[in-house]
Amino acid sequence: MRPISLRLHERPITQVLFNREGDLLFVAAKDKLVSLWYTTNGERIGSYQCGGVVYSIDVSQDSKYLITASADAKARVWDVSSGRQLDSTDFEVSARSIEFSQGDKQILVVTDQVMGCQAKIHVFDFDKDEVRKLNKSYTLPSPQCKITQATWGPLNKTIFASCEDGAVRIYCTEKRELIKTILDHNKLVTRIEWTKHRIMFMTCSKDGTAKLYDTKTLKLLRTFDTGRPINAAGISPLKPHVILGGGQSAESVTTTKVDASQFKVRFFHIVYGEELGGLIGHIGPVHSICFTPDGKTFATGGEEGLVQVNHLDESYFEFDDDLVYNPPVQH
């Protein structure tokens, strides 16, 4: 498996994202750019220029609209094909996370806790037929701590928020209030990642663990311990595998013993919890991992501004996990 290296960004990658068909790859970075690439050959199509560090992006189901959240306190809507900015909305502080609801009728935006402002989750109605695409709907109550990411639950009935205090908070979108708090991590929760159809979700944390939950019962199913901060997870839609990435943060690398192997992305079996292998490709912490919807390709983005696109070999799909964990009985 030979990765395609995408080199354009001069600062750390914040998010890598495939569209619904998996043929386009969007890359957000701290150099105020979002770049667009073809997945198959790594050819660059173009880029979208924002006014500040781009923290989060999402793309609509039909791949027509791109939304960005950036440090210049703006959420923007872009036309994917022309690169034109269609709409934007201003906040008092940086926009940290952004996501389309299922069906693309609404957008949530998370704003930072800074300069006396409380972290908030803002929900906007998204109307693609109107000139003004974003119309404010409501704001959820603040958790009184920084929110790293927010994401829509199944059928948009809930919103899940990962927080700085190690909690995952769940809000009801109908009642617009906090209904549940999960307190299983003892450090900042960096990301929430869904399985296909949102039956289960995984939380990543700076405490070195990733935890898998049942969405309906919120029961903890499995804990994956890597012994180092986890920034991102990619759950395969095709096989029972999860890829975890992270590593010591840039500021603590100089004060602790560090080697390149801790920045490799690691494959785990989602059912048995055992490590299957790893892949070295970055020389700094991995910040984002994303699978294509068909599960045949995944991309990773790192601290050094490099994006690696890995097209998985046929041998990966022919590998039968059951032969490893349930070997045939010898008579």
Swiss-Prot record:
Keywords, comma-separated and alphabetical: Cytoplasm, Initiation factor, Protein biosynthesis, Repeat, WD repeat
A Pfam entry, by short name: EIF3I
Any one GO MF annotation of this record: translation initiation factor activity
Keyword Kinase: no
Localization in the cell: Cytoplasm
UniProt cross-references to InterPro entries, sorted A to Z: eIF3i, WD40/YVTN_repeat-like_dom_sf, WD40_repeat_CS, WD40_repeat_dom_sf, WD40_rpt
A Gene Ontology BP annotation from the UniProt entry: cytoplasmic translational initiation
WD repeats: 8-47, 49-88, 142-181, 184-223, 281-320
Main localization, broad class: cytoplasm
Gene3D superfamilies hit by this protein: YVTN repeat-like/Quinoprotein amine dehydrogenase (2.130.10.10)
GO cellular component: eukaryotic 43S preinitiation complex; eukaryotic 48S preinitiation complex; eukaryotic translation initiation factor 3 complex; eukaryotic translation initiation factor 3 complex, eIF3m; phagocytic vesicle
Subunit structure: Component of the eukaryotic translation initiation factor 3 (eIF-3) complex.
Membership in a protein family: Belongs to the eIF-3 subunit I family.
PANTHER family referenced in this protein's UniProt entry, alphabetically: EUKARYOTIC TRANSLATION INITIATION FACTOR 3 SUBUNIT I
UniProt function note: Component of the eukaryotic translation initiation factor 3 (eIF-3) complex, which is involved in protein synthesis of a specialized repertoire of mRNAs and, together with other initiation factors, stimulates binding of mRNA and methionyl-tRNAi to the 40S ribosome. The eIF-3 complex specifically targets and initiates translation of a subset of mRNAs involved in cell proliferation.
Protein's UniProt name: Eukaryotic translation initiation factor 3 subunit I
Species the sequence originates in: Dictyostelium discoideum (Social amoeba)
UniProt lineage: Eukaryota, Amoebozoa, Evosea, Eumycetozoa, Dictyostelia
